[in-house]
UniProtKB/Swiss-Prot annotation:
CDD domains: eSelB_III, SelB_euk, SelB_II
GO biological process, one term: selenocysteine incorporation
Entry-linked Pfam families: aSelB_III, GTP_EFTU, GTP_EFTU_D2
Parts forming coiled coils: none
Stretches for region G5: 159-161
Database matches in SUPFAM superfamilies: EF-Tu/eEF-1alpha/eIF2-gamma C-terminal domain, P-loop containing nucleoside triphosphate hydrolases, Translation proteins
Family, similarity comment: Belongs to the TRAFAC class translation factor GTPase superfamily. Classic translation factor GTPase family. SelB subfamily.
Region feature (G3): 69-72
GO cellular component, one term: cytoplasm
Protein name (database record): Selenocysteine-specific elongation factor
Domain of life the protein comes from: Archaea
Compartment(s): Cytoplasm
Any one GO molecular function term: RNA binding
Amino acid sequence: MVISMEMKNVNVGLFGHIDHGKTQLAKQLTEIASTSALDKPKESQKRGITIDLGFSSFTLDRYRITLVDAPGHSELIRTAIGAGNIIDAALLVVDAKEGPKTQTGEHLLVLDLLNIPTIVVINKIDIANDEEIKRTEMFMKQILNSTINLKNSKIIKISAKTGEGIGELKKELKNLLDSLDIKRDINSYLKMPIDHAFKIKGVGTVVTGTIHKGKVEVGDNLRILPINHEVKVKSIQCFKQDVSIAYAGDRVGMALMGVEPESLFRGCILTSEDTKLKVVDKFIAKVKILELFKYNLAPKMKVHINIGLLTVPATIIPYKIEKINDKEEPIILEEIKGGDSCYCIFKLEERVVVDEGDKILIMRLDLPPTTLRICGFGEVIDFGEVEVKKIVVKEGKVVKKKDKIYIEGLASSKTAGEKLIGGKVYIPDKNIWGVIKGTFGTKGALIAEFDEEVNGGEKVVLKRVRKWG
């Protein structure tokens, strides 16, 4: 294949329920065989890398397209989500006869949350009747209308077996790619998640992946995280052609010196020495829980976090920022439910490579595959420590003596009362605020000043924070 400098590399995902025809569609479109075909399942099991993402490629006008075939089986949803993190657009394949299934909806939700431009491909029109095709098209239109970002997605009807409709699909895919403003960060440090690793006789260790950011040249000294191996690039291939340099967005294979394939696993990332990537076992993310998620999440609950190509078990600690006594405090949330937005600390069961701004998906993989297992989504904002607190509410009452206002019931002694001086209190029935100015006597009575007139006997509330957990 002649490679023109004007050609643009893009990555297109193939999604859909098992047996709806994704792989057959890939064969219709493909010009270059799958990268993973070089890897044998027995070898992959020995290395701990499951061969469950298929990669192949073809050209379309000015685009060199890498197809990423995501698994459709319910047990491999984590891998399908991983595929969503390395693509620019997607084809969602639906069986015309069977219609959308559970994994169809799950995959569409992933694409919607990651905001991946998508074409719905209704396949197997050669074996479905007109009524079945119309019904499937109607169902898909209804589902698309319920999405956030994919309401205007095109629906194309094809037969991957006979080739009917493939020309129209290619035309629509080109139109979609033409409409995208794909930005590649080629001036950053290198970030390339490794999805396959194997040995080739006479070449040595070869890794494949899609470059997220930066560039790589033959001869570069790089680092593999989280194992912290130093390696050197011997050669680079892009679309089966030897190249001396590759950029963000390119799907590449690289021969490396300094590492054996047995040392690598999904979650390893190839990066440059100037990297800002972190290897962590916890991070903070800004999170949104899906309206459709029917279960509540509570502190210290076990979830699964997808980040890049990796899905790892984690403990969730949700919190909000609340102003208490003029100071913003991280306050624990005892539960979060569908539609809620908050901050979360995620404590991971293994160390992972994370970039600030990385998108995450939160899942409950312990739930049955017939129900929605994706809880929500978020963005990594920090790796620092946050001491989450809880609010302690105390109640007292107003006592008026002559021209003085006192509060009783918030403290049991003068010493305890002195610790409350400066604290803000309020009358909940009237939303009147006041400040504790001092103590009175030895039994914990407090002197207070309020913004407005208050009456004796009214309930007074004091909020304070304590360390949680």
